[in-house]
Amino acid sequence: MAAQGEPQVQFKLVLVGDGGTGKTTFVKRHLTGEFEKKYVATLGVEVHPLVFHTNRGPIKFNVWDTAGQEKFGGLRDGYYIQAQCAIIMFDVTSRVTYKNVPNWHRDLVRVCENIPIVLCGNKVDIKDRKVKAKSIVFHRKKNLQYYDISAKSNYNFEKPFLWLARKLIGDPNFEFVAMPALAPPEVVMDPALAAQYEQDLQHAQATALPDEDDDL
């Protein structure tokens, strides 16, 4: 039984990607999750309970954050076991972090098989973007969802969670009725830049995939 006021619906979400892509910054934006996080010493993981209020009551994503161990090689299977969904993050200002996305995806599906996954390109607030919409094709090949995000400005913060919730619950009309309390923006996402990026993504989505069958 869930405690009084505790969301009945809970999901384990694993957050993966290269070190320095902004995973911890992203998960810390959700203030109650940051306040209530727990450290799992055996795995060296912080679990942030992120609650969202929806048209079907509150739901909770228990977000597993690696606390930087990915810098020392792969993650242990214990991190992935029983994950119900995942976010793979890369940094749009660093091409190598996008090049490594297939490795993270491979590790995930090896343990978790067929779970819903969102790919997020973080740091889109930075003007010097290296990984452009047209070169982000991995999600289309593997049937993942993709979002541009900017953790420091809260831009698109809720989008990955809403998409995952709709998939997990099986209801396309599922909505968040209120935004969670987020840390104040540290940078401002330029609305014109955001609009341009959204247009670029739509255009890229409508473009045929390149023929070569490598994983990038």
From Swiss-Prot:
A molecular function GO annotation: magnesium ion binding
Region (Switch-I): 37-45
Keyword Zinc included in the entry's annotation: no
InterPro entries: P-loop_NTPase, Ran_GTPase, Small_GTP-bd, Small_GTPase
Record-listed E.C. numbers: 3.6.5.-
Reactions that this protein is recorded to catalyse: GTP + H2O = GDP + phosphate + H(+)
Gene3D superfamilies: P-loop containing nucleotide triphosphate hydrolases (3.40.50.300)
Catalytic EC class: hydrolase
Primary localisation category: nucleus
GO terms for biological process, alphabetical: GTP metabolic process; mitotic sister chromatid segregation; protein import into nucleus; snRNA import into nucleus
Compartments where found: Nucleus; Nucleus envelope; Cytoplasm, Cytosol; Cytoplasm
Marked site: Essential for GTP hydrolysis: 69
Annotated residues for binding of GTP: 18-25, 36-42, 68, 122-125, 150-152
Chain spans, region Switch-II: 68-84
Free-text function comment from the UniProt entry: GTPase involved in nucleocytoplasmic transport, participating both to the import and the export from the nucleus of proteins and RNAs. Switches between a cytoplasmic GDP- and a nuclear GTP-bound state by nucleotide exchange and GTP hydrolysis. Nuclear import receptors such as importin beta bind their substrates only in the absence of GTP-bound RAN and release them upon direct interaction with GTP-bound RAN, while export receptors behave in the opposite way.
Similarity-based family: Belongs to the small GTPase superfamily. Ran family.
Subunit architecture: Monomer. Interacts with rangap1, which promotes ran-mediated GTP hydrolysis. Interacts with kpnb1. Interaction with kpnb1 inhibits rangap1-mediated stimulation of GTPase activity. Interacts with rcc1 which promotes the exchange of ran-bound GDP by GTP. Interaction with kpnb1 inhibits rcc1-mediated exchange of ran-bound GDP by GTP. Interacts (GTP-bound form) with tnpo1; the interaction is direct. Interacts (GTP-bound form) with tnpo3; the interaction is direct. Interacts with kpnb1 and with tnpo1; both inhibit ran GTPase activity.
Name of the protein this chain belongs to: GTP-binding nuclear protein Ran
Organism phylogeny: Eukaryota, Metazoa, Chordata, Craniata, Vertebrata
Gene from which the chain derives: ran
